Amino acid sequence: MPLNRTLSMSSLPGLEDWEDEFDLENTVLFEVAWEVANKVGGIYTVLQTKAKVTGDEWGDNYYLVGPYTEQGVRTQVELLEAPTPALKKTLDSMNSKGCKVYFGRWLIEGGPLVVLLDVGASAWALERWKGELWDTCNIGVPWYDREANDAVLFGFLTTWFLGEFLAQSEEKPHVVAHFHEWLAGIGLCLCRARRLPVATIFTTHATLLGRYLCAGAVDFYNNLENFNVDKEAGERQIYHRYCMERAAAHCAHVFTTVSQITAIEAQHLLKRKPDIVTPNGLNVKKFSAMHEFQNLHAQSKARIQEFVRGHFYGHLDFNLDKTLYFFIAGRYEFSNKGADVFLEALARLNYLLRVNGSEQTVVALFIMPARTNNFNVETLKGQAVRKQLWDTANTVKEKFGRKLYESLLVGSLPDMNKMLDKEDFTMMKRAIFATQRQSFPPVCTHNMLDDSSDPILTTIRRIGLFNSSADRVKVIFHPEFLSSTSPLLPVDYEEFVRGCHLGVFPSYYEPWGYTPAECTVMGIPSISTNLSGFGCFMEEHIADPSAYGIYILDRRFRSLDDSCSQLTSFLYSFCQQSRRQRIIQRNRTERLSDLLDWKYLGRYYMSARHMALSKAFPEHFTYEPSEADAAQGYRYPRPASVPPSPSLSRHSSPHQSEDEEDPRNGPLEEDSERYDEDEEAAKDRRNIRAPEWPRRASCTSSTSGSKRNSVDTATSSSLSTPSEPLSPTSSLGEERN
């Protein structure tokens, strides 16, 4: 399968061009994951956003392999005929032997080609394949674990497909198979057991045991080296899943994780040190003018304000122009995602705002899907009352405007006492009476199935945040994914994030953390932790993260109570900022989006694939890593301009007010010469230092005789992680409460 294609990687703004060229002739990449065209969790986002940059590199020699789901195919995939003879013969052969294999194009940016394997249609072979798995790998799978049984079927079908593809190819290609997570890991183990000529990569985005242990309130990071992993997995009835994950990690030619914190975790729980850290990125959309994303923030905030007006009808005794919107979103893991810390910090923030007489109000929204049976009637009523008031106001306005127009048309000033009649006053009084409410605005927008034991609602009852008039912090729990068709809050997630002021993600277990990354590329400040992959990555690349709107909460070395106090300090400092300071901060945050662009982070995946090829085909490819100290990263320095770090923000002029305007639109009071947005942006761009990639390791193909350059493994880990990572055996502070 010849393919004459090379890739010249363009650089980020401020970075030198990365001039390595990869000769991809007769090389094919298959990326295997359960979440191909099948949205389940964060891996779907990784594959979806990375597809374009990978497709630009590999062209039509890049395929994604995933499970067939009727819903996914109906809404996301265009079914096509196989484009090559080898692939067509492979599909025909498998379909003729009792399998159902589909081929098409995933309708996302980049339009990658996908091979979808119908797991359910192959259930007839499950018992035979489970027996073969036991004979080959000594891994037994219980009958009651449907997810694990699906993983067995998917793994055998994937191996069958790869073996058939190699057999049907006239020119034997160099195949790279990249497997994501334990659900796809069986296929990797079988490829090695059957000695298929395939270069294999296994990426774990979060270890199974790590997620289970952290959910159980274990002092995880202080005891990594002390866990009896077999015992812990057995007690949680996931030993067979753990064996699948560990076997895949050990069988792979190259083992990668998404962050250094997960690399340390994998080294202790899976007993193999990752070869490369491959951070997760996003497709960054750059705006032609800085004010564009600021305008989007204002528009989205207006949508959220409409929802708040309805939700708090009858108790709307706070100024919406002086209201900040904080949010937390993600999988409903109360402790792992840090919802417990956030709620406690909100209670303390409420106390600080009240005793200091602050006019600022905070609305904290929890977007975490939970079990519900319907919308809360009181919440629906609030939105209905808001719409009724709006319609009443418009009706009166139209009548008033028509009478005013007719009066002016005849050349006389109107008699204001006759502009509104009794019917109008009656209508307005009825609208006012409709806003009367005896109870507090509801905390939860839905009826929960387990209201009495729900962790968020239980904690809210304990800390007493009931949305009373005296509270400066209001709480809204929205236990459902956001949708633009919702009758309550009709916005999608991206629009919602743009309308908020601060994302709060104080996670205890977060191998990467897409939610704060999404905030960053949209110019929204966020709070992360030094136990999340994203937090560690930004801490490594930015000298003073908080100055750029990335607050890093210390959950490594502090107790739970101290972490709550630090988070409270962050939140209170943010509340003290002026509108002008928040605008400047959002500008700085948005400029960090270059760090998270797949155009840059995709290089780590290139390096992993190159290493795998050299290990699987040493006679054709060589990978020569340079000395680890030859690679140097770069760091954004702390901005020198006013205002300084938001946590230490002070007024930049003696006459600061909330009415200050955007600093990009003209002079700003007396200190306008001290801050210029264009100059600030240029300075930040210059602050990006080009990574001094080591001398390129050669990757030589005997068929083409051309050099295949590669990036050193050490570079990948040194740029995405601290050069001297914290040893898991060292003390991480007080025990977690």
UniProtKB/Swiss-Prot annotation:
Ranges annotated as biased composition (Acidic residues): 658-681
Chain's role: Glycogen synthase participates in the glycogen biosynthetic process along with glycogenin and glycogen branching enzyme. Extends the primer composed of a few glucose units formed by glycogenin by adding new glucose units to it. In this context, glycogen synthase transfers the glycosyl residue from UDP-Glc to the non-reducing end of alpha-1,4-glucan.
Domain of life: Eukaryota
Lineage of origin: Eukaryota, Metazoa, Chordata, Craniata, Vertebrata
Species name: Macaca mulatta (Rhesus macaque)
Reactions performed catalytically: [(1->4)-alpha-D-glucosyl](n) + UDP-alpha-D-glucose = [(1->4)-alpha-D-glucosyl](n+1) + UDP + H(+)
Listed Basic and acidic residues bias regions: 682-695
One Pfam family named in its UniProt record: Glycogen_syn
Protein name: Glycogen [starch] synthase, muscle
Alphabetized UniProt keyword annotations: Allosteric enzyme, Glycogen biosynthesis, Glycosyltransferase, Phosphoprotein, Transferase
Pathway involvement of the protein, from the record: Glycan biosynthesis; glycogen biosynthesis
Free-text description of this protein's post-translational modifications in UniProt: Phosphorylation at Ser-8 by AMPK inactivates the enzyme activity. Primed phosphorylation at Ser-657 (site 5) by CSNK2A1 and CSNK2A2 is required for inhibitory phosphorylation at Ser-641 (site 3a), Ser-645 (site 3b), Ser-649 (site 3c) and Ser-653 (site 4) by GSK3A an GSK3B. Phosphorylated at Ser-641 by PASK, leading to inactivation; phosphorylation by PASK is inhibited by glycogen. Phosphorylated at Ser-641 by DYRK2, leading to inactivation. Dephosphorylation at Ser-641 and Ser-645 by PP1 activates the enzyme.
Gene: GYS1
